[in-house]
C-alpha cells in the first residue's frame, strides 16, 4: 500500500496577501508506507511497555512492525519523499518570495525534510496504532513473491514520477484510458475504493493546508490578521480542485505502478486491503502521515512567513 505524494502542504491552495494571490502547487496522493528509520521510537515503545505483564509481547510486536516495514523498502521511499519535499521548497520560494530565499531557505527546507526525524514521527505513530493488530496476514502477503514485486513496482513508480515528463505522460495515459473506458480502470477503482485513497487524501490535504495557513499566520505573513474561521473557509473553498487533482494523481500513479501486474494480481492486493488487518494498516498509515504532514506543513508555513516578510530566520 504505497501510493502517496507527500511533498509538504498538499494540494494547490491560494494564500492571499495584500491583494496578491500566492499559489501553492503541490499535489496529494495516496497512502504511502513510510520507511522506519532511526531507533528512538522503538526504544521509547519498549520503555513504555516495561513494568507491565505484556512487555515481552509488546516488544515482539514492535520488532515485527520493524521487520514488516524493512521488507517494504521504506528507506528508499523516505528518500524519495525528501526529494519531493526539496523540490516543493523550490516551488514555494518561486511563488511566495522569489529571489529572497537563497541558501538560508534551502537550509530550512533541508532541516524540515530530515529523513531521520520524519521516520521517527511516522514510526512512533505506527508502533502505537498497530500495537494490537495481527500482523501475520500482512507479513505473509508482503513476504511473498507477489508482495515483494508489488513493493518494487510501487517504489519504482514513485521514483519515476520525480521527473515531470514522466508524470505528464502518466496523466496522458490515464486520460486516454478514460476516453476508451478501459476495463483496467475498474480494477484500479476497486483497489482505490478499498483503501479510501481519494477521500482520505483529500481530508489530509485540507488538514495540511490549514496547518500551512496557521504557520503563515503565526509567522506574521498576513498584513490583515486571519482568524481560524477565515482560514477554514479559505482552505475549504479549494476542496473541489483538491479532489479533482487527487483523483488524477491517484489513478495516474496506480496505473503506472501496477502496469506489469495482471488484473488478478491487483485483485488479490485489494482482497488483502479489505481484511481487518489490511484496513488497520491503512488507517495506521494515514494517521501517521497526517501527523507528519501537519508537522511539516506548519513548519513550512512558519518559515515561509519570515521570508515573505523579508525577515531572516
Go through each PLM region and give its residues.
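Bacterial N-terminal signal peptides
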Residues: 25-37
Amino acid at each position: 500500500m504505497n501510493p502517496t505524494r507527500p511533498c509538504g502542504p498538499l494540494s494547490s491552495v491560494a494564500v492571499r496577501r495584500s491583494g496578491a494571490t500566492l499559489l501553492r502547487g503541490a499535489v496529494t496522493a495516496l497512502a504511502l508506507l513510510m520507511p522506519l528509520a532511526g531507533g528512538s521510537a522503538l526504544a521509547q515503545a519498549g520503555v513504555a511497555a516495561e513494568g507491565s505483564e505484556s512487555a515481552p509481547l509488546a516488544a515482539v510486536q514492535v520488532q515485527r512492525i520493524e521487520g514488516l516495514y524493512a521488507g517494504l523498502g521504506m528507506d528508499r521511499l523516505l528518500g524519495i519523499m525528501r526529494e519531493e519535499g526539496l523540490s516543493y521548497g523550490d516551488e514555494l520560494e518561486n511563488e511566495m518570495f522569489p529571489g529572497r530565499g537563497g541558501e538560508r531557505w534551502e537550509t530550512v527546507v533541508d532541516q524540515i525534510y530530515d529523513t531521520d526525524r520524519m521516520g521517527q514521527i511516522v514510526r512512533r505513530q505506527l508502533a502505537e496504532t498497530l500495537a494490537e493488530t495481527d500482523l501475520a496476514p500482512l507479513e505473509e502477503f508482503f513476504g511473498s513473491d507477489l508482495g515483494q514485486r508489488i513493493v518494487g513496482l510501487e517504489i519504482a513508480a514513485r521514483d519515476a514520477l520525480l521527473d515531470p515528463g514522466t508524470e505528464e505522460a502518466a496523466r496522458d495515459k490515464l486520460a486516454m484510458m478514460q476516453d476508451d473506458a478501459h476495463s483496467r480502470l475498474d480494477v484500479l477503482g476497486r483497489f482505490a475504493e478499498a483503501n479510501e485513497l481519494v477521500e482520505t487524501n483529500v481530508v489530509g490535504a485540507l488538514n495540511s493546508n490549514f496547518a500551512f495557513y496557521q504557520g503563515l499566520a503565526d509567522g506574521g505573513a498576513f498584513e490583515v490578521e486571519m482568524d481560524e474561521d477565515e482560514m477554514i473557509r479559505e482552505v475549504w473553498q479549494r476542496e473541489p480542485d483538491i479532489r479533482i487533482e487527487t483523483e488524477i494523481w491517484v489513478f495516474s500513479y496506480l496505473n503506472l505502478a501496477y502496469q506489469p501486474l495482471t488484473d488478478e494480481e491487483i485483485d488479490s492486493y485489494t482482497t488483502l486491503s479489505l481484511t481487518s488487518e489490511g484496513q488497520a494498516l491503512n488507517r495506521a498509515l494515514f494517521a501517521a502521515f497526517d501527523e507528519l504532514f501537519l508537522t511539516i506543513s506548519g513548519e513550512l508555513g512558519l518559515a515561509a512567513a519570515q521570508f515573505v516578510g523579508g525577515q531572516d530566520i
